[in-house]
Amino acid sequence: MLRLLLSGRNNGRRPDKDRSYCPHDDIYNRLWSILGGPDCARGVRSVEVRLRVLVACEFSGIVRDAFIARGHDAMSCDLLPPESPGPHYTGSVFDILNDGWDMMIAHPPCTHLACSGAAWFEKKKKNGKQQNGIDFFMKLAEASINKICVENPVGIMSSLWRTPDQIIQPYYFGDEYQKTTCLWLKNLLKLKHIKVDDLFDKATHVNKGEMIKYASGKVMPKWYAESRGNGHLRSRTFQGIAKAMAEQWG
């Protein structure tokens, strides 16, 4: 049906902007965009620009590999060695921060910034660890890179710096988990996610995942409770979010 629709309008060419408006133009133009413009008539995907992408403070390789799968030149960086094969710099991100990146996805440590650790904030203020965390966060956020996403859980940077541009959940993008994630964006659009199917898009939202309720009344995602004491597991980016970043920003 889509082939008939496209082949029946200007033989696969973009419609003439000077002709009178037709009620079906909006639908046609949306299909034209989704299917790749003039290349869609030939079954060829539109050529995309290859970006140099730095994924800062990532040892899992999840976001890095999502961008590589899209044809980009991506490299992860962390003080820890990588968990999976692929381009990775083991060391300080500041060693390579100014190496001509087009985009950076940064995951600065949240240990001293997240609201979940509020009970220890006074101690962290006194020993300087919180200020070190703030300084590290801001150096990444203010880096001389055209496109930047800084990711962190809900924490003090929302008040010390500015509110995040977007707050997302893994279940928005196909993973049945809850993990409130804040994104501060520079020259990047908010990640698109779809609650329910519509004419053009399939829903990306899924179930939120199992929750655990403690005797105190506190409620917590089961996966998060079971990963207590494993900060590395809790810090990983979910596959659905990584894929959305690569598809929409790459």
Where are these regions (language model features)?
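Glycine-centered signal
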Residues: R13-R14, V44
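Intrinsic-disorder-associated, low-complexity terminal segments enriched in Asp/Asn/His/Tyr and depleted
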Residues: N10, D16-Y21, D26-N29, D39
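Conserved active-site and SAM-binding loop architecture
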Residues: R30-G250
